[in-house]
From Swiss-Prot:
Major localization listed first in the record, in broad terms: cytoplasm
Species annotation: Staphylococcus haemolyticus (strain JCSC1435)
Taxonomic lineage from the root: Bacteria, Bacillati, Bacillota, Bacilli, Bacillales
Protein role: Increases the formation of ribosomal termination complexes and stimulates activities of RF-1 and RF-2. It binds guanine nucleotides and has strong preference for UGA stop codons. It may interact directly with the ribosome. The stimulation of RF-1 and RF-2 is significantly reduced by GTP and GDP, but not by GMP.
GN (gene name): prfC
GO molecular function: GTP binding; GTPase activity; translation release factor activity, codon nonspecific; translation release factor activity, codon specific
Name of the protein: Peptide chain release factor 3
Compartments reported by the entry: Cytoplasm
Sequence positions that bind GTP: 17-24, 85-89, 139-142
């Protein structure tokens, strides 16, 4: 198979949603239908002892939530699919944002009872900013929810995107009978004991069935015909341009509508895209020279070995295990001998990968999030990945002073993951950690105890705003006050931590020569 044919067979996407919309469950069922796993677990499995394949971390299994992006690869038909299940919780949106930099399309999961929720809206905006095509899966049709037209209107009005229903539900909740498939004009029943039914060209039922006289069926047919008459033919270019989202109705937990979605996804989703660099060079996935970038680092995927994996998206050329690459940030060459693919925490050695593939590189501390790797003499670096400005800050120390070595190792590795941000006071070297939300600190504390055997003491700093400094040479000691604590971040940049907006404005008025800025 040629490089071009290999690249064209890749599909790489992330699943995004508000917490509890069914994102991780959908991931499980996609793996199940592809044959990648024999049994689909469920995130509700805290009581049963069964956990989602993508929720591999201990804290995820205990809480039944996703707090880190999982990477999984599987084959389906003639395609190789890379799927990234992202954290739904808003406190971990930075990890999700970085993950969205590594995919070519996204699947938006919506709870039919709740519609568009805040986290869904935030993540959709990132996809739109990046020009990522979006597929929509409206979930939990076997429960009572909003009417289909109401959901479509909400998507179109809130997200400013056209919708194209690929199927249409018959009933809802306890009266949910199934879905009408738009292309085949067939009815897929929700219950296994029912057979597939077919519609003729006039959308009349061809088989004899009791549902023929059901009011829910009559209403669904009427709505379906309105959709057909009002809508145009499916426009794949509009999808790829982010102007239209194909909509699928189903129930991930019940294994219903998932395979229909997967079949349509591989038909319509884009192949790997070209990538922009800081030097304004566009790198084609078909370029012969290998290139890739690190978008995620994860420590302790195997707690027994304290390993560290750097996740790399291949952008161009072919990766071969054992090849020499250059880390652009340091200009140092290295031979990559340990590379792996994933089914959550299950790993398999990767000898070959092409554009669109996500592979794990064993990391001894060489890599940082955003690093560019190249196989030839390329001089470019891919565009930087987003970093958020924290809103909560805590002083952190080890409860047991004899555990300092483990404490500092844990801090170093979890900070390098991007799970939490690191600061240090100038004169006392007090460690201060910053996070977007409180749950990040809870997960940090849990992981320090379970992965590094260190109990930590955390104390609020009383600061809510971090601002970086453009002109660091103008900083003076008198600026380090009770209202404006001066610290350094992990890259040795100066940062002021302020109590509130009032303190920030007071500082800017008192020291107008200092130019402050925030991250995302």
């Amino acid at each position: 198979m040629s490089l071009k044919e290999e690249v064209e067979s890749r599909k790489t996407f992330a699943i995004i949603s508000h917490p509890d919309a069914g994102k991780t469950t959908l991931t499980e069922k996609l793996l199940y239908f592809s044959g990648a796993i024999r049994e689909a677990g469920t995130v509700k499995g805290k009581k049963t002892g069964k956990f989602a394949t993508s929720d591999w971390m201990k804290v995820e299994q205990e809480r039944g939530i996703s707090v880190t992006s999982s990477v999984m690869q599987f084959d389906y038909d003639d395609y190789k699919i890379n799927i990234l299940d992202t954290p739904g919780h808003e406190d971990f949106s930075e990890d999700t944002y970085r993950t969205l930099m590594a995919v070519d399309s996204a699947v938006m999961v919506i709870d039919c009872a709740k519609g568009i929720e805040p986290q869904t809206l935030k993540l959709f905006k990132v996809c739109r900013m990046r020009g990522i095509p979006i597929f929509t899966f409206i979930n939990k049709l076997d429960r009572v929810g909003k009417e289909p037209f109401e959901l479509l209107d909400e998507i179109e009005e809130t997200l400013n995107i056209d919708t194209y229903p690929m199927n249409w539900p018959i009933g809802m909740g306890q009266n949910f009978f199934g879905i009408i498939d738009r292309d085949s004009k067939s009815i897929e029943p929700f219950r296994d004991e029912e057979n597939v039914l077919h519609l003729n060209d006039d959308y009349e039922l061809q088989e004899e069935h009791a549902i023929r006289n059901d009011s829910a069926f009559a209403q669904a047919i009427e709505e379906f015909m309105l959709v057909k008459e009002a809508g145009e033919e499916f426009d794949n270019d509009a999808l790829l341009n982010g102007e239209l989202t194909p909509v699928f109705f189903g129930s991930a937990l019940a294994n219903f509508g998932v395979q229909n979605f997967l079949n349509a996804y591989v038909d319509h989703a884009p192949m790997p895209n070209a990538r922009q660099t800081n030097e304004e060079v566009e790198v084609s996935p078909f370029d012969d020279e290998f290139s890739g970038f690190i978008f995620k680092i994860q420590a302790n995927m195997d707690p027994k070995h304290r390993d560290r994996i750097a996740f790399m998206r291949v952008v161009s050329g072919a990766f071969e295990r054992g090849m020499d690459v250059t880390l652009q940030r340091t200009s140092k060459k290295q031979k990559i001998t340990r590379s792996t693919s994933f089914m959550a925490d299950d790993k398999e050695t990767v000898n070959h990968a092409v554009a669109g593939d996500i592979i794990g590189l064993y990391d001894t501390g060489n890599y940082q999030i955003g690093d560019t790797l190249v196989g030839g003499k390329q001089k470019y670096s891919f565009q930087d990945l987003p970093q958020f400005t924290p809103e909560i800050f805590m002083k952190v120390s080890a409860k047991n002073v004899m555990k300092q070595k483990h404490f500092h190792k844990g801090i170093e590795q979890l900070v390098q993951e991007g799970a939490i941000q690191y600061y240090k006071t100038l004169h006392t070297n007090q460690i201060i950690l910053g996070a977007v939300g409180q749950l990040q600190f809870e997960v940090f504390e849990h992981r320090m105890k379970n992965e590094y055997n260190v109990d930590v003491v955390m104390e609020p700093v009383g600061r809510k705003i971090a601002r970086w400094i453009e002109n660091e040479d103008d900083i003076q000691d008198k600026m380090n006050t009770s209202r404006s604590i001066l610290v350094k971040d992990r890259y040795d940049n100066f940062v002021f931590l302020f109590e509130n907006e009032f303190a920030t404005r007071w500082f800017e008025e008192k020291f107008p020569e200092i130019k402050l800025y925030s991250l995302l």
